[in-house]
Amino acid sequence: MGRTREAGCVAAGMVIGAGACYCVYRLTWGKDENEKLWDDEDEEEEEEEESCSGKPEIGGKTVKERKTHVGVGAGAKPQDDSKSKAEANVGPENGPDVKKEVYPESHSEGGLEAKAKALFKSLKEQASAKAGRGIRFPNISRIRTLTSSLPCPGGRGGGCHPGRTGSRARNRTSGKVKRKNRSKSNKAPATAWPVRRGKFSFPYKIDDILSAPDLQKVLNILERTNDPFTQEVALVTLGNNAAYSFNQNAIRELGGVPIIAKLIKTRDPIIREKTYNALNNLSVNSENQGKIKTYISQVCDDTMVCRLDSAVQMAGLRLLTNMTVTNHYQHLLSYSFPDFFALLFLGNHFTKIQTMKLIINFTENPAMTRELVSCKVPSELISLFNKEWDREILLNILTLFENINDNIKSEGLASSRKEFSRSSLFFLFKESGVCVKKIKALASHKDLVVKVKVLKVLTKL
C-alpha cells in the first residue's frame, strides 16, 4: 500500500504541475498578444504623424492621405480588407478640400475607446516607474530592457520577439513549428542496442531447422555477400542449426566450415562473435574439430588482443574451451599460457570463470604440466584464493591447484625445482607457501561445498 500511495501522490503532483504550467503559458501568451496589438497601433499612429508633418501639401491635398481617429489618442480597430472604409469631407482644417477617412463607428464608442487607451497608457507608465530597470513590461518606449540572466520570453529558443513586420504571421508559423517539435519529442527513444537494417530479404528465419539443400543455400549466400546484415543473419541461422548433431555433419559435408571461418578476419566485432558462436556449436563434433584446428591459433590471437571482457572475447574463450576438451589440439595453444593467466587476473567475473575452465582443460592433461608450470604468472593471482570470491570461482581455482599439484607429483617435477624461475606458476603454487596458507584459511568458509573441496585439497598436500 505504501508504494501505491507514493505512486498516487507522484501522479497527482505531476497533474497539478502540468496544470500550473499551462495556466502560466496561457497568461503569458495572451499578454504578449495584447502587447503586440497595442504596439502595432502605436506604431501606425507615429508613422502617419511623421509622414504628414514631413511632406508638403500639393494642390490642397497631402502626398499621403492622413487617417483621422475619432477621439483623443484612440487607435483604429483592425478590420478585414473586404470591408470598405467610409470617406468624408470635413471642414477646412489644414486646407481646403482635405480628404479624411473616418470609420463608421459612433462618436460615443470612439470616446470610450480613447479613454480606455489613455487609462491603459497611464497604468503602463506607473508600472514602469515602480518596477525600475531590468524587468520587462509592455512596450512603452519601444526599448525592452532585460536582465542579463533572464531570456526574453516569447522568442524562439529563449530569444527576443521577432520583428514587427509580419509578426503575427511569423508567430503563427513559429507556433506550428513548436507544436511539431513537441510531437517529435513525444516519440519513444531509440533502443540502446544497435539494430542493423539490410535491404536483402533473407529467405529463412534464424530459428528454422533447415534441411541440407536449405543449408547449402544459406552457405552460398554467406559466401557471396559482403553485406554485414546478411552475414550476421546467415551466421546466426547456421549457428542455431549447428546445435543439432545431424546438421553438424551436414554443414561439414557441404564445406561450410571454411566458409564460416573466413569471417574470423573481418573487423566487425559482431560478425566475429557470430562466427565464433557458429564454430563453437560445430566443434562439439570431433570430426568438425579436425576442420576447425586450422584456425585455432588465429582464434586464440584474436581473443587475446580484442577488447577486455567483450562479447567477442567470451565467444572466443568458449570456442577454445571446446577445442581443448580433448588432448589432441592442446599443444597448439601452449604458447598462450602467460596470456591466459594474465586474462585470469584482469578479466571480470565471467571472463575469470571461462578462463579457468580453459586452463583446467590443460591441467587434466599431464603431458602439458611442464609447459604450464614453467610459464610466468602475475603474483596477484594468489588473490583468487580469498574468501570474498563466490563459490564458482573458489571451486575452479581449487580444482586448478589440485590438478597441478597432482601432476607435479606424477611427473616428478618436484625434484627439478631449479628449472623454474621465481615468477613461474610452479614457484607460486608449490614453493612460496603463500598459496597453502590461503587454502587453509578457506577451511572456515561459510559455504559447505567450498569447505569439502578445501579439505580434499589439503589431504593431498
From Swiss-Prot:
Regulates mitochondrial transport during axon regeneration. Increases the proportion of motile mitochondria by recruiting stationary mitochondria into the motile pool. Enhances mitochondria movement and neurite growth in both adult axons and embryonic neurons. Promotes neuronal survival and axon regeneration after nerve injury. May link mitochondria to the Trak1-kinesin motor complex via its interaction with MIRO1. Residues 1-6 are mitochondrial intermembrane. InterPro entries: ARM-like, ARM-rpt_dom, ARM-type_fold, Armadillo, Armcx_regulator. Residues 30-461 are cytoplasmic. Pfam families: Arm_2. Keywords: Membrane, Mitochondrion, Mitochondrion outer membrane, Repeat, Signal-anchor, Transmembrane, Transmembrane helix. It is found in: Mitochondrion; Mitochondrion outer membrane. Residues 1-6, 26-36 are annotated as: Mitochondrion outer membrane (MOM)-targeting sequence. GO terms for biological process: hematopoietic stem cell homeostasis. The keyword Transmembrane helix applies. Interacts with MIRO1. Residues 34-110, 148-192 are annotated as: Disordered. It comes from the Eukaryota. Disulfide bonds: none annotated. The chain crosses the membrane at residues 7-29. Residues 38-51 have a biased composition (Acidic residues). The gene is Armcx1. ARM repeats lie at residues 203-243, 245-284, 366-406, 423-461. This is Armadillo repeat-containing X-linked protein 1.
